[in-house]
């Protein structure tokens, strides 16, 4: 591979970043995968697979490992950032001086900015300026299934129509990976953050032992909260019936591959927050997202009772069963009311 002809540079060599890099390379593209830990990258290069997260999926020959950030960013104008939301802004500030003049940025990070609750588009604009094309991909994607080539579909939104078309062409694979372009840049970002919160709640419900009826009710009312917040931010309500909304919500609320769901189940079974986090052993995005989504809802005056009760469990020490009973004990109302 020449130094500047890769189709994509992927920033973040965790399970999801690796899975996306494998998918791109499997499509026949030259892909550079960068990670912040040189030892980890050296191990990936030696093993030619991600033994820790995706041990059964060998790397295609067109997937290249790189520990030098400048070299990785010089390799392609297209940069795919796949890092936890709480380090997103730091990573963008780190890569900005090293990016090519023709660079374009897409992220698969799901969440909001830590502490402020800002959308990641606002973080990216602040860090990178107004000229660089931006895009986001989101949807129901477990890394193991994506890397294994099992059928998957996602949403893609961008500020730039040409960039959206190019990304769809790069990512889309008729055999296993469908990419739908969505014009709603705000909604596609927001869905990925709110679903993390609701997935914790679904896990709590199952951990308590409330059953399938309760889980389904929580998912449905969680979708209502997602749509309500989206409307306040100017998102298209139809987005939340697509891959980045309902699709991702159902996946993470119902399958134990979801760290957020497993975390919630442990809380529902009586484990404390730190103990559950330690047992998961990886970042539980929904833990921070709960605080951020709650902050965003308060800022826009949006009532989100499920999110509020999950916040009370995570940050105020409320018992999960007590939180569930608080929700069940709310005043009677019409299903389609705005509150």
From Swiss-Prot:
Q: Which residues form the active site?
A: 195 (proton acceptor)
Q: Where does sn-glycerol 3-phosphate bind?
A: 110, 139, 141, 195, 248, 258-260
Keywords, sorted A to Z: Cytoplasm, Lipid biosynthesis, Lipid metabolism, NAD, NADP, Nucleotide-binding, Oxidoreductase, Phospholipid biosynthesis, Phospholipid metabolism
Q: Where in the cell is it found?
A: Cytoplasm
For this record, an example GO cellular component is: cytosol
**Signal peptide as annotated in the record:** none
| One Gene Ontology MF term | NAD binding
What GO terms describe the biological role, i.e. biological process, of this protein?
carbohydrate metabolic process; glycerol-3-phosphate biosynthetic process; glycerol-3-phosphate catabolic process; glycerol-3-phosphate metabolic process; glycerophospholipid biosynthetic process
EC nos: 1.1.1.94
What role does this protein play? Answer: Catalyzes the reduction of the glycolytic intermediate dihydroxyacetone phosphate (DHAP) to sn-glycerol 3-phosphate (G3P), the key precursor for phospholipid synthesis.
Q: What is this protein called?
A: Glycerol-3-phosphate dehydrogenase [NAD(P)+]
Q: Which organism is it from?
A: Salmonella typhimurium (strain LT2 / SGSC1412 / ATCC 700720)
Q: Name the lineage.
A: Bacteria, Pseudomonadati, Pseudomonadota, Gammaproteobacteria, Enterobacterales
